C-alpha cells in the first residue's frame, strides 16, 4: 500500500509540475487553455474556472496534458437551423450560446441559427421571431454544447497556431524546463536533509556507529593519512588503499590505519568487515556543511543525474532494447522499493525521474515536446508557418509510434516485475 501511495504522489507531482509549465506560459502567451488534465481516460473529477479552463483528474496514471485552443479538432460546428438560446450582455453582445436543453436562461433570446463566425468576425446570424438578425459575439463568450458541456469560443488571436513563435517555443519548452527545476530543487533539499554534501576531495571521514573504525577509536572528522603504508589524501585514495590492504586478508587479521585527530597522529589496528566480496572499515566521506556547499552539492547531483540519463539514452540509441526502458509499471516498482528505504530514497527517485522526464520530452519525436520545439524552430528558419495538415499528420505519426512503444514497454515491465 505504501508503494502505491508513493507512486501516486511522485507521479502526480511530476505531471502537475510538467503540465503547469505548459499551462502557465500558454496563458502568458495569450493562448486559450481548454483543459488541464492529470492522467488519462475517464474523468474522476472536473472543475471549470472563470477563464474557461477545464481542470480534470482522470483515472489512468499514464501522463497528463494541456489542451490548447486551435489544437486538433477544436472547432464547434453549429448546423443550419439549429435552435439556440442567446444570452446578451449589457452592451448587446452575445455572451452565451446555448445549444442544449439544459442550463436554460429565462432571459435568453431564442434563435434558429443560419450562420456564424466565432473566430474572425465574431458574429451569429439566425431567425428570431421569423426575422433574420445578426448579433455581435463577445470575445470571451461561451457555448453550451448539446451534451451540456460549456466551453469558451476561441477567436483566432487566442489559438495556439496564431501565437508568436517565441510564445509557442517557450510554451513547449516550459514542461521539460519545470522538470529540470523540480529535479534541481529536490536534489538541493536532499542534500540539506542529509546534512551536507560528501567531500570526496578530502581525507576527513565520518565514522559509522559500531563500525570497525569506531571500535578502533576513530571519531567523526578525523583525518586518515595512511592505510597499511598506502598514502591517503582523498576519498578515492582511501577506497583504493582499503582494497589493496585487504587483498588476501585472513578472517581475523587487521590493517594499520594512521590518522590525525586533534592535531595528533595515531596508528591503530582496524579489523575490516566483509560485505559480499568487499571489505569496509566503517567510514564515509565527510560532509561539506556550508550553505553554499549544499546548494552547489544539489546542483552537482542534478548534473550527475542528467549525465547518467544522457549516457543511458546514448546506449539506447546504439543498442536498442526494451529492457533499457521503463514505463508506469517500472516506475511503480521503483517507487515501492524507494518507499521501503525511507524519505531520502523517495526524494532521490523523484529528482531523477523528474530530470529523466525533462530529457525524454526533449527528444525530437513529433508527439513529444521536443518534436513541437523542432517544428517551431523550422518555422522560424523558414519564416512561414508549417501547414496545419502537415503538422497534424506528423504529430499523428509520432503519437502512433509512442503508443506502440508504450504498450510494448508496459508489457515488458509487467513480465519483468510480476513474473
UniProtKB/Swiss-Prot annotation:
Positions with a binding annotation for Zn(2+): 18, 22
Enzyme class: hydrolase
EC number: 3.4.24.-
UniProt xrefs under PROSITE patterns: ZINC_PROTEASE (PS00142)
TM spans (from-to): 169-191, 301-323, 343-365, 392-411
PANTHER family: MEMBRANE METALLOPROTEASE ARASP2, CHLOROPLASTIC-RELATED (PTHR42837:SF2), REGULATOR OF SIGMA-E PROTEASE RSEP (PTHR42837)
Annotated ranges, domain PDZ: 175-274
InterPro entries to which the protein is assigned, alphabetical: PDZ_6, PDZ_sf, Pept_M50_Zn, Peptidase_M50
CDD domains noted in UniProt: S2P-M50_PDZ_RseP-like (cd06163)
Membrane topology type: Multi-pass membrane protein
Family: Belongs to the peptidase M50B family.
List of catalytic residues: 19
GO molecular function, one term: metalloendopeptidase activity
Keywords, comma-separated and alphabetical: Cell membrane, Hydrolase, Membrane, Metal-binding, Metalloprotease, Protease, Transmembrane, Transmembrane helix, Zinc
Main location: membrane
Presence of keyword Zinc: yes
Disulfide bonds: none
GO terms of biological process kind: proteolysis
One Pfam family from the record: PDZ_6
Domain of life of the source: Bacteria
Cofactor list: Zn(2+)
A cellular component annotation (GO) from this entry: plasma membrane
Name this polypeptide is given: Putative zinc metalloprotease M6_Spy1682
Compartments where located: Cell membrane
